[in-house]
């Protein structure tokens, strides 16, 4: 279930892996250590020519991907793999590209290859988990999110926790969804998707007061135009359950303004609050 409007069909974890790919250095044989035991700082001069080529190609691939120029992005990844046939991030990037191109079989092949090359890479686990969840394979996806979250070296675990919660919501496992989402909230309180997902969890559990708490937070941490019709309709239904006609009308105005032709707005016009 999608809660935030996106420019393309990107999963919530895509931005993370793009950042990881763009910033990842290509490791050499290892920096020298002195008596202190501390490693020398790795700089650009420590990279081999092949490693620099891979990094440049991957940065170009990310740029094309963000512009939705998937064929050009794919070409850059292929060139990166010519320089380093075992570059895990390149296979992960190619998985994302194929996913956006609708080539789901090729996407999975590359995600699996990336995971085999770097089984401890949390970003790759997160993105493969997101792929599986979008395919409805929740039972396979959740262990991958768990693996990412268990990695203490993972610098940005909040989106993975949110993705896991969103995935659990798909199978109406509200207890697991709540657990994952509260973890995400603790890590990054202002992540809009997490607040929207928690509002959904508590609405489904008929705890409308707590649902409204996260709807109110969402109003503070997200731009109104970024919210999907689904989220705005959820906000309307929460206010309807609480009997707050003023707030209900306010959210309805936003739904009409930003998504006038949506099925959610049509449902609001019918008064179909319990569908």
For the regions a language model picked out, list residue spans one by one.
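C-terminal motif of bacterial Sec signal peptides marking the signal peptidase cleavage site
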Residues: 22-25
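Terminal, low-structured helical/coil segments at or just beyond the last alpha-helical repeat
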Residues: 31-45, 221-275
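Structural marker of alpha-solenoid helical repeat scaffolds
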Residues: 49, 83, 117-118, 151-153, ...
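Alpha-helical segment of the N-proximal tetratricopeptide repeat
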Residues: 49-83
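Helix-start (N-cap) detector for alpha-helical repeat units in TPR-like alpha-solenoids
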Residues: 54, 88-89, 122-123, 155-158, ...
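Canonical tetratricopeptide repeat
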Residues: 59, 93, 127, 162-163, ...
């Amino acid at each position: 279930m999608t809660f935030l409007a996106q420019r393309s069909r990107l999963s919530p974890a895509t931005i993370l892996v793009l950042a990881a790919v763009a910033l990842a250095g290509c490791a050499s044989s290892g920096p020298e250590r002195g008596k202190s035991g501390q490693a020398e700082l790795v700089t650009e001069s420590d990279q081999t020519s092949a490693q620099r080529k891979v990094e440049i190609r991957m940065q170009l691939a990310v740029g094309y991907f963000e512009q939705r120029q998937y064929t050009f992005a794919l070409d850059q990844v292929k060139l990166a793999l010519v320089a380093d046939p075992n570059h895990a991030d390149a296979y992960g990037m190619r998985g994302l590209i194929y996913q956006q191109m609708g080539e789901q079989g090729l996407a999975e092949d590359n995600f699996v290859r990336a995971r085999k090359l770097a089984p401890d890479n949390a970003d790759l686990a997160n993105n493969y988990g997101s792929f599986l969840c979008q395919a409805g394979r929740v039972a396979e996806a959740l262990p991958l999110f768990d693996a990412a979250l268990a990695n203490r070296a993972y610098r940005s675990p909040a989106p993975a926790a949110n993705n896991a919660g969103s995935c659990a919501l798909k199978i109406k496992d509200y207890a697991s969804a709540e657990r994952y989402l509260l973890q995400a909230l603790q890590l990054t309180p202002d992540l809009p998707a997490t607040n929207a997902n928690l509002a959904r969890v508590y609405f489904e559990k008929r705890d409308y007061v707590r649902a409204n708490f996260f709807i109110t937070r969402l109003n503070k941490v997200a731009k109104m135009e970024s919210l999907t019709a689904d989220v705005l309709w959820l906000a309307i239904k929460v206010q309807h359950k609480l009997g707050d006609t003023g707030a209900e009308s306010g959210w309805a105005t936003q739904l009409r303004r930003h998504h006038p032709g949506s099925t959610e707005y049509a449902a609001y016009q019918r008064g179909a609050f319990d569908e």
